[in-house]
């Protein structure tokens, strides 16, 4: 049995350096699928520590295919796995925030546990997800937003894919995705499926150089800022850590309806996003997009607080900027020069 697996089975937690070595072994293909499944199961059962998470993140970031970072870009990648089957809120928020002037490096993947992953819905919207590190950077520079399709940037993840799929439950990799943006962004909005996990991720992030990160977990179970219940937030900014909660009413929004933001496929998700940008969607869908885009605008440094960011996002949707931004994102690179 793998020595790290044996240690965890015996109740030990791993130091950061040990966690790094374990992740290297998984990423190198040096562990069997049963060993990988075993370690993921043990960690999920007892709960990961911030030290372990930080060690895993260091390796994931170091091995990511990247051409270097860009200043002041923001990511809206969340953990997923909330089981509520909403449309792709973080993707709609990313497009809206980029329409309002934020530089967005959206990290994401196809669906694993949800009805629609960010890559799935972007394809349905007509946005290319097959991008190299260089073309992502050019897209951010030219269009304010680029999409980093996780399998293209984290090729070593192929060694754990089978074990993850076979396990079928949330593992540490749900937490690692948002923490492993290949451009190593320092500004993020991270939706988390539980507030305990948000606290864990915040503690791990404090071991890295971050400028402004919001981790959000709603009390209705959403891994987003919600319009149907209060949302608990951890904010990391300038070396400080704040915890607080917000409610939809603080932003002038009436309590929304979950059924208005739920979908059964990536096609439905894409259609709802198009309707939001065309000002034809239910108010719940509009408001939840504005709220989450507002958080991205705020963490990008373009608003003084979440309320101002949300107001800016709402205007970007209502005045057609978000719809026009989606059309820009659909353009191929050569068409931008035509």
From Swiss-Prot:
Anthranilate 2 binds at residue 164. GO terms for cellular component: cytosol. Binds 2 magnesium ions per monomer. 5-phospho-alpha-D-ribose 1-diphosphate binds at residues 78, 81-82, 86, 88-91, 106-114, 118. One of its GO terms (biological process) is L-tryptophan biosynthetic process. Mg(2+) 1 binds at residues 90, 224. It catalyses: N-(5-phospho-beta-D-ribosyl)anthranilate + diphosphate = 5-phospho-alpha-D-ribose 1-diphosphate + anthranilate. Pfam families: Glycos_trans_3N, Glycos_transf_3. It is an enzyme of class 2 (transferase). Mg(2+) 2 binds at residues 223-224. Keywords: Amino-acid biosynthesis, Aromatic amino acid biosynthesis, Glycosyltransferase, Magnesium, Metal-binding, Transferase, Tryptophan biosynthesis. SUPFAM superfamilies: Nucleoside phosphorylase/phosphoribosyltransferase catalytic domain, Nucleoside phosphorylase/phosphoribosyltransferase N-terminal domain. Anthranilate 1 binds at residues 78, 109. Its cofactor is Mg(2+). It comes from the Bacteria. GO terms for molecular function: anthranilate phosphoribosyltransferase activity; magnesium ion binding. The keyword Ribonucleoprotein does not apply. InterPro entries: Anthranilate_Pribosyl_Tfrase, Glycosyl_Trfase_fam3, Glycosyl_Trfase_fam3_N_dom, Glycosyl_Trfase_fam3_N_dom_sf, Nuc_phospho_transferase. Its EC number is 2.4.2.18. Pathway: Amino-acid biosynthesis; L-tryptophan biosynthesis; L-tryptophan from chorismate: step 2/5. Belongs to the anthranilate phosphoribosyltransferase family. Catalyzes the transfer of the phosphoribosyl group of 5-phosphorylribose-1-pyrophosphate (PRPP) to anthranilate to yield N-(5'-phosphoribosyl)-anthranilate (PRA). Homodimer. HAMAP family: TrpD (MF_00211). This is Anthranilate phosphoribosyltransferase. It comes from Bacillus velezensis (strain DSM 23117 / BGSC 10A6 / LMG 26770 / FZB42). The gene is trpD.
């Amino acid at each position: 049995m793998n020595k790290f697996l044996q240690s965890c089975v015996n109740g030990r937690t791993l130091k950061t350096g040990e966690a790094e070595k374990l992740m290297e072994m998984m990423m190198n293909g040096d562990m069997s699928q049963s060993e990988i499944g075993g370690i993921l199961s043990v960690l999920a059962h007892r709960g990961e520590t911030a030290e372990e998470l930080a060690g895993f993140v260091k390796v994931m970031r170091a091995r990511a295919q990247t051409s270097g970072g860009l200043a002041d870009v923001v990511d809206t990648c969340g953990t997923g796995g909330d089981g509520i089957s909403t449309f792709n809120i973080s993707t709609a928020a990313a497009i809206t925030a980029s329409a309002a002037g934020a530089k967005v490096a959206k990290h994401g993947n196809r669906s694993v546990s949800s009805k629609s992953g960010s890559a799935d819905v972007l394809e349905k919207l007509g946005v290319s997800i097959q991008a190299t590190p260089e073309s992502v950077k050019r897209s951010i520079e030219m269009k304010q937003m680029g999409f980093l399709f996780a399998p293209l940037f984290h090729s070593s993840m192929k060694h754990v894919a089978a074990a993850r799929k076979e396990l079928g439950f949330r593992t540490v990799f749900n937490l690692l995705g948002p923490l492993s943006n290949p451009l190593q962004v320092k500004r993020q909005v991270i939706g988390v499926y539980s507030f305990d996990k948000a606290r864990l991720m915040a503690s791990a992030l404090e071991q890295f150089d971050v400028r402004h990160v919001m981790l959000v977990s709603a009390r209705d179970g959403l891994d987003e800022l919600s319009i149907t219940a209060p949302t608990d937030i951890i904010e990391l900014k300038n070396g400080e850590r704040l915890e607080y909660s917000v409610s939809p009413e603080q932003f002038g929004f009436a309590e929304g309806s979950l059924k208005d933001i739920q979908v059964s496929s990536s096609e439905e998700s894409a259609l709802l996003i198009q309707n939001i940008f065309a000002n034809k969607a239910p108010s719940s869908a509009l408001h939840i997009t504005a709220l989450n885009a507002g958080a991205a605008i705020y963490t990008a440094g373009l608003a003084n607080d979440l309320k101002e960011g949300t107001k800016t996002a709402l205007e970007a949707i209502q005045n057609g900027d978000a719809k026009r931004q989606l059309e820009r994102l659909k353009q191929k690179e050569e068409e931008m020069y035509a």
